[in-house]
């Protein structure tokens, strides 16, 4: 991980907006109608509260979604402009993978993140279930990470802890980031979890976390083995959540990779299909 001089500023507009300097409490706006207008003001407020100025920024971590177009674009444009003006390092971070890291910290009983995020209070620490003969059954928690996509859809990914299947290089995604309706997400998750359980002989518990998790709580009841349902984001967890989000971005940063938004949803405006060709019709001919 590259060491960055100066402070680290986090800007995310994947759901409302969150702005903060690592080591300090972030400023969170939940009103999606006004968060874009307040973004630059809140950046100035966050820097002032930390006793810092633009010249002190060494790194900017910006959320790249997945999220709806307008708000996400505003955050990316602002972060890129600020990085250009200050010479700060710019790193993009998706919003879904840190949700998994946050929930795993809560399952381990991490007091720092649990105390910072009241919405994690009901998350039970990892426990083992018994088999019929009394022997403990291997059990692992996997995370259905979600973010509200509006239109009754969710952005989501199905994450597991790398190495759980015996390979430290195993991807943390069992289902890569996508957008879908909650009912269909449940079908896809159940199918993948059953397939993995047959291969590994383990029992998997699915925890659901992110903005939109509570809204579709009824849908999650159809998951084969439902754990906790947590309505909240890592960026709702105060200074501790902000630091975890930035730490994850820095740990996995690729300075050669472009920082671009993850929209996932196809645009509403599409190129129209060509007109159907009419048999034996070559178009109107100009008369001589």
Language model regions located:
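N-terminal beta-alpha supersecondary unit
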Residues: 1-66
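Surface "functional belts" at beta-alpha junctions
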Residues: 28, 89-236, 268, 283-286
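Short glycine/threonine-rich catalytic loop with a Thr-x-Gly-x-Asp
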Residues: 32-36, 70, 233-240
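Phosphate-handling active-site elements
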Residues: 51-55, 83-94, 111-112, 254
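DPxDG-like acidic metal-binding loop motif
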Residues: 59-95
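Acyltransferase
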Residues: 214, 228-288
């Amino acid at each position: 991980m590259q060491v960055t001089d100066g402070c680290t500023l986090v800007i995310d507009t994947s759901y409302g907006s969150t702005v903060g300097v690592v080591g300090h409490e972030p400023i969170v706006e939940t009103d999606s109608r006004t968060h874009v207008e307040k973004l630059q003001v809140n950046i100035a407020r966050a820097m002032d509260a930390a006793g810092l100025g633009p010249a002190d920024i060494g790194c900017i971590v910006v959320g790249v979604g997945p999220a709806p177009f307008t708000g996400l674009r505003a955050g990316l444009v602002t972060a890129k402009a600020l990085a250009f003006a200050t010479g700060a390092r710019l790193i993009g971070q998706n919003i879904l993978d840190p949700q998994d890291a946050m929930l795993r910290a809560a399952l381990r009983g991490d007091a720092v993140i649990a105390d910072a995020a009241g919405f994690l209070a009901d998350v039970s620490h990892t426990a083992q279930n018994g088999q019929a003969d009394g022997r403990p059954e291997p059990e692992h928690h996997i995370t259905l990470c979600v973010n509200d996509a509006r239109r009754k859809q969710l952005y989501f990914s199905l994450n597991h802890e790398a190495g759980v299947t015996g390979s430290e290089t195993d991807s943390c995604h069992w289902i890569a980031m996508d957008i879908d309706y909650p009912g269909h997400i449940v079908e896809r998750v159940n199918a993948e979890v059953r397939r993995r359980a047959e291969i590994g002989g383990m029992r998997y518990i699915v925890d659901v976390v992110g903005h939109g998790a509570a809204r579709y709580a009824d849908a999650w009841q159809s998951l084969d083995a439902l754990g906790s349902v947590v309505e909240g984001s890592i960026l709702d967890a105060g200074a501790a959540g902000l630091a975890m989000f930035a730490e994850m971005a820095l740990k996995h940063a690729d300075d050669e990779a472009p920082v671009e938004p993850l929209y996932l949803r196809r645009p509403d405006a599409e190129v129209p299909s060509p007109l159907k060709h009419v048999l034996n019709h070559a178009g109107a001919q100009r008369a001589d």
